[in-house]
Amino acid sequence: MAASPIRRFSQPAVTATIATARLELGLFALVLGVGLLALRTDFGYDGQMMYKVTESLALRHSFQVQDPAWHANEPYAYFGLGVSLLLLPFYGLGALLTGDGTRLIVLYGPLVTALTAWVLFRLLRELGASASRAVAIALIFAFGTLAWHYSTTIFSEPLVALGVTAAIYWLRVYQRDPRRRWLLAAGVATAITLLARWDSVLLIAAPLAVYAVYQIVRARRLSPAVAGLFTFGAPLAAALAANLWYDWLRYGNVFTITTKNALEGSFTTPIWTGLYGLLLSPGAGLIIYVPVLLASAVSLRGFYRQARPEAVLLLSLLALRLLFYARWSSWDGREWGPRYLLPLLPVLLVPLICLPAQRWIRIGTFVLAAVGIGVELLGQLVPYDTTVWPTTAPLVVSTLQLHDAAGSTCLCSWFVDAAASTAMDFDIHFAPLTRQVTLLLQGTVDPSWRAAWPMRGFLLALAAAIAVLLWRSAHRAWFTELYAGPTGSL
């Protein structure tokens, strides 16, 4: 399959010109603004527990919390510290300005997503993409993938996505400019993923460490390898020590990383069931929720030819995560779409910089991106946590006559809850997207959107216009760079 004619990856000088700075600021502001349009934060169970740790630290200087729902997070939450610590400034500022620490928590998710889109843009430029293509891919990430939905939630996965994208970006910068400051930045970004989730030791830190060693060895003539390894590894060691200390505090043993209650079922899902569920199932399949990844897969061959180390890293990250979570009993993450695959969404879009030049592929990519944006807009209009799950789960229980061993049909039963989730994952009639379309046709819309739909509709249209203007501005900037001196951009 032929690739676009311009495909050389030179050493692109990503300079802080006024035009580039304006473009980056515009991208960040647009993603942040649209993310804040919903003005809501659906905490979910995970988010509630992580927020409770934040609240306990702020009010009582303690890590202990209460879990009235499942009692699985008492007296300590089994989630990572990363999100809870990052929520502290929002809680403190909210308490200071409004007297309510929860008020400004709504800023956290959109801010993380906007930062991720910005870092993704810089990574794409560092890999040689033109400004216009980098803007387009960053906007697809922000509004055509699950990132939009998860910007209105409190989960650890968006933070991991930011960390892994930033780490790859800074390691790639180090390839061009072998100064240890970039290794330190990459190490800090990787350490953030460790603080957010323990599984990042295997799923994120290990592949990134191999990639970092590769970059350091390549630059050994200009920078001592041992010093470089120490610079990258020091933040990881600090994060690992913090996690081990937190485990000792919670469980009295640094070798215990969770509680028995948190492991209900553990790695019991048949591997092929989990893989089908994560990738293709009607209720939680990645391709169903993010169809533009099909175009990314088509582009992978060209990307592998032009950036083999990054392509191998991407495939390693994906393979590890798929194999790990395909066996997990709650592989779907009990949320909208495959939550556990969210951390890789930014980097999975990177191969699009090598999108083949055939017209039908370009048109197909545009259509897939538009479908993805439509899916995300549907997720905003008919939210999963406040509308879809509360109406669909009871319907599943009554239709399929689900009950636990004691005969209870209550969704407060772990067995009934899991069985309802499984039905929504694999039965297209109960799949979230099917139900969202049905509910939308019945006139069921999120109250905040129903009450302010003219204004929000106008703001969305304005955001779309700004996105087009950003792309056109980036396109003009690329031509300016081209005539000033070719850099091998894509």
PLM feature segments, named:
Residues M1-L36, R125, I216, S223-P235, ...:
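Start-transfer (signal-anchor) and selected internal transmembrane alpha helices
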Residues F28-L32, A134-T145, T165-Y169, A186, ...:
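Short helix- or helix-capping micro-motifs
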Residues R40, Y214, V226-S299, L314-Y325, ...:
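Membrane-lumen/periplasm interface segments of specific transmembrane helices
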Residues L104-G128, L162, A166:
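Transmembrane-helix motifs of polytopic, lipid-linked glycan transferases
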Residues G128, E157, A167-L183, A219, ...:
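Membrane-interface transmembrane helices that cradle and orient dolichyl/undecaprenyl
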Residues V135, V173-A191, V226-A227:
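Short hydrophobic alpha-helices at membrane interfaces in multi-pass membrane enzymes
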Residues V173-P178, L203-L240, A297-A307, V350:
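Perimembrane helix-loop-helix junctions
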Residues R218, I287-V312, L348-L355, R362-A370, ...:
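Hydrophobic, aromatic-rich transmembrane alpha-helices
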